[in-house]
């Protein structure tokens, strides 16, 4: 009959599971479950994860944990396996706590609405009653429940399981233990052999990787089991160090030893009395159970959370404000002392330092805070009970904003705790009640708040001395009341007398517009396009203001001496031509400096170029165009071509340079040829010098690269030579391998023949020996044991 495994866990099974986990670890659940006859590997693992793991927190849930649980349930609905490690609990604990919070909220709402009924007999069953198991039902999740106490009389199966577990867990000298020890020694020798082999291969230049971890298992030599890495970041340990120092100073080793001794004596005395009273019971079992109980208490004490530090709200009255209040009080006292006994001035000063002693001062009530947990539960219930979105209608109203945990991140939104500051708005606390209201505001009221005394009734009170409300609705009502009061007082003024007044007629003024026209906000894309168009037009206008040389991208001077250029322009005698030359020199210098070409050498300080208006530039261009359209341009062009041709014919080397004999004598021709030769020679020398300079410059810049190229070329040659040598060696060794393989077969055949010959001779010798032995035995038998007369 198959055995159905599962059910409630007992205390014995828990202890066996703990011992098995301590021996086999957290990765061999099949071996662990072999010690428990009624549990499967999955159930053993679930029991450890859900209940027996020392890292599980079983203390009461705090308010922060409830708030975080509801916030994460809102962000990740039904993902309890993901929520559990964030909250610090198990998935089952999170689910049960979540359901309990919803049930408590529902019960609270029913009590508020009066749905509880007249008595418990008429009320509906609670959530705990619904979830409580009825007789005959099985717990669907027994791994997360406390263990059942052990019975006095154990079943035969339980006794057999317990004895087998004791034998297997306590066996360290039996056959299996010895076999395990031999296996460990073999494994160690195998590991050392692998290390030796790896060391030899490494010395030979071959690196291999040792993989000792089996697939699906943990390498306990390389990894750390049960490791819980700390969160990254730096933490301030000043407070912890100070607390440790205080505890170390308060610790007295003598008192501690005395207390431990007394405690040990008391425990031993109680244990002795217990053993004496219970003689029939198994003392060893009770001692083990007692030790297990003590260890459980120690573990629970370690799991309990530390006492949290006191978190005080930030004060609203800062040090500077406190100093200002003190200075104000000192200034009032100083003014009172300066007045002295003058009654006229003394009546204008009030004493604001003295407080009314007979009135008890209450602590101002802090503003009410939103209950995030209750709001989140209401939101969850509203979303659960809402109708389908297919039916239409309005959305479910939820608590958003500051009244909920929000969706800012994985952690819920925190409320900023502040203390009320009555000094910030004196006499205007909407949540305060006057202890001794004075009707009509005739004098200062003795309020429980720390408000200054109002001797001159500057702060008027409303409704019998109650402080003025600070809500928007009350402020609006107060303003409307003040307006009505002013209108009533103005209406109560006497009517004006009937008197005619003659006023001078004032000049008419243009009517002001009734209100400023509101323009719609301009789109950012339209604004960017408009600004881009404006910048483009400004750039085009600036481009047109430049010279034609820059506009047409004509070459500009590379080597220029501005001072020499300006001096040459100033030497022109004709005033009109001089002005033109100066302006041209300024334009050339400005273009050379402002739009310099790469590698240009400009000497001298550039002169400031006067910026002309666009109107004048257009007029000048129109005048030049009109002048160019006339016949003078053609005449000037012809004259320029003629002079250019004549100048080029006289300077260019060629046949055109040499005139006829009747026009020029031989001496002048010789001198011209000599001059041309000198010019060509000078040009060649200059070109050679420039080439040498350029060669030096290139050698300076690229000398390192050339050396590097030479070195790499040499290395490549060496590598090629080594490669060729290696190829030759490889071919030689391959030839040797082929010849060796052929020779090996021949040698093996020869050795086999020799072995066969030796074996054949050995068989023949054995056969001959056997024959001789038989002959000797027959001879001895025939002679009766006498050979040569001897027995």
UniProtKB/Swiss-Prot annotation:
Involved in pre-mRNA splicing and cell cycle control. Belongs to the CEF1 family. PANTHER family: CELL DIVISION CYCLE 5-LIKE PROTEIN (PTHR45885:SF1). It holds the Pfam family Myb_Cef. Disulfide bonds: none annotated. Residues 523-551, 705-779 form a coiled coil. One of its GO terms (biological process) is mRNA cis splicing, via spliceosome. SUPFAM superfamilies: Homeodomain-like. This is Pre-mRNA-splicing factor cef1. GO terms for cellular component: cytosol; nucleolar peripheral inclusion body; post-mRNA release spliceosomal complex; Prp19 complex; spliceosomal complex. It comes from Emericella nidulans (strain FGSC A4 / ATCC 38163 / CBS 112.46 / NRRL 194 / M139). Residues 110-188, 225-318, 390-471, 494-526 are annotated as: Disordered. Associated with the spliceosome. Residues 1-56, 57-106 form the HTH myb-type domain. Residues 280-292 have a biased composition (Low complexity). GO terms for molecular function: DNA binding. It comes from the Eukaryota. Keywords: Coiled coil, Cytoplasm, DNA-binding, mRNA processing, mRNA splicing, Nucleus, Repeat, Spliceosome. The lineage of its organism: Eukaryota, Fungi, Dikarya, Ascomycota, Pezizomycotina. Residues 128-151, 240-255 have a biased composition (Basic and acidic residues). InterPro entries: CDC5L/Cef1 (IPR047242), Cdc5p/Cef1_C (IPR021786), Homeodomain-like_sf (IPR009057), Myb_dom (IPR017930), SANT/Myb (IPR001005), SANT_CDC5L_II (IPR047240). Residues 29-52, 80-102 bind DNA. It is found in: Cytoplasm; Nucleus. Gene3D superfamilies: Homeodomain-like (1.10.10.60).
């Amino acid at each position: 009959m198959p055995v159905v495994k599962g059910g409630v866990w007992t205390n014995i099974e828990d202890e066996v599971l703990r011992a098995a986990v301590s021996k086999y670890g957290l990765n061999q659940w099949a071996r662990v479950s072999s010690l428990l006859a009624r549990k499967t590997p999955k159930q053993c693992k679930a029991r450890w994860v859900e209940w027996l793991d020392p890292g599980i927190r079983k203390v009461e849930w705090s308010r922060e944990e409830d708030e975080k649980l509801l916030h994460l349930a809102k962000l990740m609905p039904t993902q309890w396996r993901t929520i559990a490690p964030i909250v610090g609990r198990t998935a089952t604990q999170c689910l049960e706590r979540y359901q309990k919070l919803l049930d408590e909220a529902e019960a609270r709402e029913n009590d508020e609405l009066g749905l509880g009924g007249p008595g418990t007999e008429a009320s509906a069953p609670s959530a705990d009653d619904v979830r409580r198991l009825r007789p005959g039902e099985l717990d669907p999740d027994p791994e997360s429940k406390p263990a059942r106490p052990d019975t006095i009389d154990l079943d035969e199966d339980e006794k057999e399981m317990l004895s087998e577990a004791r034998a297997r867990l306590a066996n360290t000298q039996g056959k299996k233990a010895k076999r395990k020890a031999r296996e460990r020694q073999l494994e160690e020798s195998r590991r050392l052999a692998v290390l030796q082999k790896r060391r030899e291969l490494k010395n030979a230049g071959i690196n291999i990787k040792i993989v000792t971890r089996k697939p699906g298992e943990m390498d306990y030599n390389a990894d750390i089991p049960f490791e819980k890495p700390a969160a990254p970041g730096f933490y301030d340990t000043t407070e912890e160090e100070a607390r440790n120092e205080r505890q170390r100073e308060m610790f007295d080793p003598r008192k501690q030893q005395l207390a431990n001794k007394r405690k040990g004596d008391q425990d031993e005395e109680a244990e002795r009395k217990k053993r004496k009273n219970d003689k029939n019971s198994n003392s060893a079992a009770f001692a083990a159970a007692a030790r297990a109980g003590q260890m459980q208490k120690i573990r629970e004490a370690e799991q309990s959370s530390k006492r949290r530090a006191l978190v005080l709200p930030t004060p609203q009255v800062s040090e500077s404000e406190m100093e200002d209040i003190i200075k104000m009080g000192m200034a009032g006292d100083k003014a009172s002392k300066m007045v002295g006994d003058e009654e006229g001035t003394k009546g204008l000063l009030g004493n604001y330092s003295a407080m009314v002693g007979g009135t008890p001062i209450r602590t101002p009530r802090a503003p009410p805070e939103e209950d995030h947990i209750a709001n989140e539960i209401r939101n969850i219930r509203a979303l659960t009970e809402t109708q389908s979105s297919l039916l239409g209608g309005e959305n479910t109203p939820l608590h958003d904003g500051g009244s909920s945990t929000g969706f800012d991140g994985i952690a819920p939104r925190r409320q900023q705790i502040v203390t009320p500051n009555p000094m910030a708005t004196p006499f205007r606390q909407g949540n305060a009640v006057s202890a001794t209201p004075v009707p009509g505001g005739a004098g200062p009221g003795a309020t429980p708040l720390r408000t200054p005394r109002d001797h001159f009734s500057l702060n008027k009170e409303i409704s019998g001395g109650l402080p003025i409300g600070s809500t928007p609705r009350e402020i609006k009502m107060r303003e409307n009341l003040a307006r009505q009061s002013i209108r009533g007082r103005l209406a109560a003024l006497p009517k004006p007398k009937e008197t005619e007044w003659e006023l001078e007629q004032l000049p008419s003024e243009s009517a002001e517009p009734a209100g400023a026209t509101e323009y719609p906000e301009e789109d950012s894309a339209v604004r960017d396009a408009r600004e881009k168009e404006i910048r483009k037009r400004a750039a085009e206008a600036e481009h047109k203001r430049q010279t034609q040389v820059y506009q047409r991208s004509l070459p500009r001077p590379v080597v220029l001496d501005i001072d020499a250029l300006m001096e040459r322009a100033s030497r022109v005698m004709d005033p009109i031509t001089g002005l033109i030359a100066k302006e041209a020199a300024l334009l050339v210098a400005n273009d050379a400096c402002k739009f310099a070409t790469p590698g240009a050498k400009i000497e001298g300080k550039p002169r400031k170029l006067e910026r002309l208006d666009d109107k004048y530039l257009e007029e000048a261009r129109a005048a030049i165009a009109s002048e160019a359209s006339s016949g003078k341009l053609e005449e000037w062009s012809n004259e320029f071509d003629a002079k250019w041709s004549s100048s080029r014919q006289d300077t260019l080397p060629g046949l055109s340079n040499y005139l006829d004999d009747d026009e020029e004598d031989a001496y002048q021709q010789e001198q011209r040829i000599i001059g041309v030769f000198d010019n060509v020679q000078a040009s060649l020398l200059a070109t050679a010098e420039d080439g040498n300079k350029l060669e030096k410059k290139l050698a300076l810049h690229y000398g390192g690269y050339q050396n590097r190229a030479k070195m790499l070329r040499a290395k490549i040659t060496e590598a090629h030579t080594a490669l060729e040598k290696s190829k030759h060696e490889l071919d030689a060794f391959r030839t040797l391998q082929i010849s060796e393989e052929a020779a090996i077969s021949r040698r093996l055949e020869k050795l086999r023949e020799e072995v066969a010959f030796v074996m054949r001779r050995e068989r023949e010798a054995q056969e001959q020996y056997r024959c001789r032995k038989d002959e000797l035995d027959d001879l001895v038998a025939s002679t009766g044991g006498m050979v040569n007369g001897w027995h």
